[in-house]
């Protein structure tokens, strides 16, 4: 009897394709010391809304949530009386993206941390910018010098937002723009425009790949 080694060899040399873990379930907790980690004694928060951009669910008594399907992007709706902790780049830590160290082996999202903020202002002031449409690092420098720096230390806002077009078809500029806007010291949100899409995308679903990775969800809610 002759045994063929070809199938085994083909399996051995076949490339291994990494599959992004879905972010389908997780938890929201009260981060009383604001360190972004769930420490002993920090309770789960009930009644917090979480969304995948289509479905909205509410956390249970232990602060846990379960979405009905596998989600590539999950966001927590920051409620009034709380603030979101900051990500490493300074943006508010309100989203989880599958396959980017935001999920564990079981598919659970990294827990969302919300910090109590009982002295929230009665009236919200926000900085809203639109169509910065930077096309180069030089444009980013102009944006920082002429728009951001005059505001630094001189505004009374509690929230900031940039409306698209954030760049002029160059997603590589997102990190530099984030450095500029987060220097104003308020949570900063973004809304994409038609010039914020990946021009090499092969489908509509993939067209905001870079935006999602650097700036977060394109569908979300924020409460004050």
Predicted region positions:
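Bacterial N-terminal signal peptides
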Residues: 7-15
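Beta-strand-rich domain onsets/edges
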Residues: 15-23
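N-terminal active-site segment of His-dependent metallophosphoesterases
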Residues: 23, 95-174
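A short, amphipathic beta-strand motif
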Residues: 24-30, 63, 112
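Structural motif
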Residues: 27-44, 117
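Short, acidic Ser/Thr/Gly-rich low-complexity loop/linker segments typical of extracellular
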Residues: 36-38, 44, 51-68
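A short, solvent-exposed loop/turn motif at the edges and junctions
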Residues: 52, 73-101
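Extended active-site neighborhood of metal-dependent phosphoesterases/phosphodiesterases
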Residues: 172-224
